[in-house]
Swiss-Prot record:
HAMAP family: S_AdoMet_synth1. K(+) binds at E43. The keyword Nucleotide-binding applies. This is S-adenosylmethionine synthase. Its EC number is 2.5.1.6. It comes from Xylella fastidiosa (strain 9a5c). It is an enzyme of class 2 (transferase). One of its GO terms (cellular component) is cytoplasm. Residues 99-109 are annotated as: Flexible loop. Binds 2 divalent ions per subunit. Binds 1 potassium ion per subunit.
Amino acid sequence: MSSYLFTSESVSEGHPDKVADQISDAVLDAILVQDPRARVACETMVKTGVAIIAGEITTSAWVDLEALTRKVIVDIGYNSSDVGFDGATCGVLNLIGKQSPDINQGVDRKKAEEQGAGDQGLMFGYATNETDSYMPAAIHISHRLVEQQAKIRKKSNSPLPWLRPDAKAQITLRYEDGVASAIDAVVLSTQHDPGIKQKDLVEAVREEILKPVLPSKWLHKGTKFHINPTGKFVIGGPVGDCGLTGRKIIVDTYGGSARHGGGAFSGKDPSKVDRSASYAVRYVAKNVVAAGLADRCEVQVSYAIGVAEPISISVTTFGTGKISDDKIEKLIRQHFDLRPYGIIKMLDLIHPIYQPSASYGHFGRKPRELAYTNSNGERVVATAFSWEKIDKAEVLRADAKLK
């Protein structure tokens, strides 16, 4: 019997890098409400007392970036100088320029379906049947822990009123013959008010954050718990560390369980294949696994700037496939249009649906409807996390001729 350990981590919405991601995606969403054809590449940096918004944006929309940035920061929980960062009073610096026309001529075409990729690059999508969300268990649990921290922190009459926004979680799982069998270690660090005793903090975090989330079947006498192991975490958020958009790409995806092409997601409109193609191949891999064609599936796709058709599509099922990887690849080419236009249409991506994805992972989330009013005053209902649907599983299984 082979045995090994595997670890993944997540960070809360109050982590400085995630603050930056959420601002970038809030800017993207606000622009898409007014201008669905906008080209957006928005980068954010947050540090003590300031948020800097930069990047390249081409749009007919007008957005009050200062007010929007402040709202995101305050909604996260940085609303007072007492916690070290106050969205109401921090400086907001706008350094946004326009997208290069050299790029634009390769993306926009007379025929929409001929839309070229916004850049060259390679992207990976992954799915596994070890959790109901088709996500690796370590990253799935890590996300739920920091999500629970925020839920308890924001709760009215919170049982943990001393919690602050910044937090991190890490899960180490033991695998036996490739199957997750136990939690070997749990690490959770949460920012807190001064004055809380370490003993009281540890007990409260165990009861209110860990206990509701950790699967009891995987806990055992030897499970190690490290809760605020430094003993103090008062200084956090943008005061403790500079935050940058796109610096948590492994947290955003599969926690290291799958490969990564290197491109970040937040602040990018769906013409950027770094984002849209990564969503598409997650959709593909998840439907392959949901169809029962494999227990694990990783799909790679690559593009050339200005070219519509993918340069390559490859599939790996790590020996878990019920049919050959070659046959799965043929089914993917048959049922999924992985041109940029095809992806945008297939997943209905030109809507303000992105800010929710900027914390707690872009994958493994439940699709949900979001309503908004567009620039014509019309009410529109869009689906966030549309790439998490498994609506192609049945036809894939049928065409694979699996019983």
